[in-house]
């Protein structure tokens, strides 16, 4: 092996990193007299950028699948900060391509992996198929996604209705990774799954 004298080793003076994310234009700015607010906003925007690629991921350090709950939970922040006119269309087309014949919308889209149970069928995730077009309309005054994907939306609502007992939907992951002390993360621990599942059911039929 080759051994070099320590004095000959290169010296690291600076490291720069660059965000790699898709081409959604950044459309807004935020500035206040409070640096905590400014830095918090910058952190949030950078976190959203880090998750925007061909799909919207839920954590940039490891997750590479398009978990759909992130689309509507982060939706307002995304719409306020970025132009989603093409990205939202792409997400809805992925949802259409992934939707099963019975109307189920998988938790991830595109469905590169077929999971089991709540990791494939959870109302809090699948409801993005209905919430996203209406959110698009709310922010842009553009009903094109509702018109184009109405069949997808209706099929999903009909599917959820078929799973309900006395208008209560009881399946899925619920409030995934809610707070717990000294226990592994997982399916909702503090909130009954039927509560959040049915809440999302009512959101999509409203």
Feature roles, as predicted:
Residues 1:
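Ligand-binding face of N-terminal immunoglobulin V-set domains in extracellular IgSF glycoproteins
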Residues 6-43, 49, 56-108, 138-197:
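Active-site acid/base region of carbohydrate-active enzymes
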Residues 47-50, 132:
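Short alpha-helical scaffold segments that flank and stabilize functional sites
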Residues 71, 126, 133, 198, ...:
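TPR repeat positional signature
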Residues 111-112:
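Mature catalytic domains of secreted/periplasmic carbohydrate-active enzymes
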Residues 123:
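N-terminal/domain-start segments enriched in small and hydrophobic, helix-friendly residues
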């Amino acid at each position: 092996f080759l051994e070099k004298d320590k004095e000959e080793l290169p010296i690291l003076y600076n490291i720069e990193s660059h965000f790699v994310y898709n081409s959604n234009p950044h459309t807004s700015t935020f500035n206040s007299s409070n640096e905590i607010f400014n830095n918090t906003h910058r952190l949030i925007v950078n976190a959203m950028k880090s998750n925007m690629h061909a799909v919207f991921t839920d954590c940039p350090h490891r997750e590479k699948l398009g978990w759909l709950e992130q689309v509507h939970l982060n939706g307002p922040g995304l719409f306020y900060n970025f132009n989603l006119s093409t990205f939202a269309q792409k997400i809805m087309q992925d949802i259409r391509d992934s939707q099963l014949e019975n109307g189920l919308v998988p938790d991830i889209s595109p469905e590169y992996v077929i999971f089991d149970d709540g990791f494939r069928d959870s109302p809090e995730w699948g409801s993005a198929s209905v919430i996203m077009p209406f959110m698009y309309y709310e922010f842009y005054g553009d009903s094109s996604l509702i018109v184009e994907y109405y069949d997808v939306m209706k099929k999903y609502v009909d599917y959820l209705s078929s799973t309900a007992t006395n208008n209560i939907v009881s399946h899925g992951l619920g409030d995934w990774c809610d707070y717990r002390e000294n226990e592994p993360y997982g399916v909702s621990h503090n909130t009954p799954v039927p509560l959040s599942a049915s809440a999302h059911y009512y959101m999509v039929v409203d």
